[in-house]
């Protein structure tokens, strides 16, 4: 069973080959997008009877981050903490750059340089592009944001797919599209 966010075990490094996931939550993130991308990993752990995936919630600052629905989630870690992860999932709002300061962008660059997979759900692709991590890639994001993204980042191709994978970078359209992305990863990693 995965550790609860904020518990001491949630900040420890994985054991027994569990894939460590850092989930970046920025204010007014989509709770549906978060649940859709995260729940398949929880179910995989349960069905396997062991921890295949471990996740920790990270904020621009440690503390409460409120979803667009008003539900607060406590992040035990901030982007200033020393964090390693095999996979980073970026969960943002319909105004993704509003809470993405220099520290967040530097954190994404640092984890990319360390070889982490970078996943952006919903509008998270805006942050990866702003951090300079999407050049030459094809990405997808929430349909309402496709035109604005294409206008701001003309060097990045966009698609209307549920999700796109390009090397260590994956993007998905938000809503329940995260289920498809996560299930594809689980199938590749554990059959």
Where are the regions a protein language model picked out?
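Short beta-strand and adjoining strand-loop segment in the mid-core
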Residues: 128-143, 169, 186
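Residues on a specific face of well-ordered alpha-helices
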Residues: 39, 143, 147, 151, ...
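Extended, subdomain-level signal for the structured scaffold at the beginning of enzyme domains
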Residues: 1-118, 127-130, 159, 183, ...
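Conserved active-site and cofactor/substrate-binding residues in soluble primary-metabolism enzymes
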Residues: 32, 36, 144, 173, ...
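Conserved anion/nucleotide-ligand pocket segment
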Residues: 161-191
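Generic secondary-structure signature for well-ordered alpha-helical cores
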Residues: 46, 151-154, 187-191
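A conserved active-site-flanking secondary-structure segment within enzyme catalytic domains
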Residues: 135-165
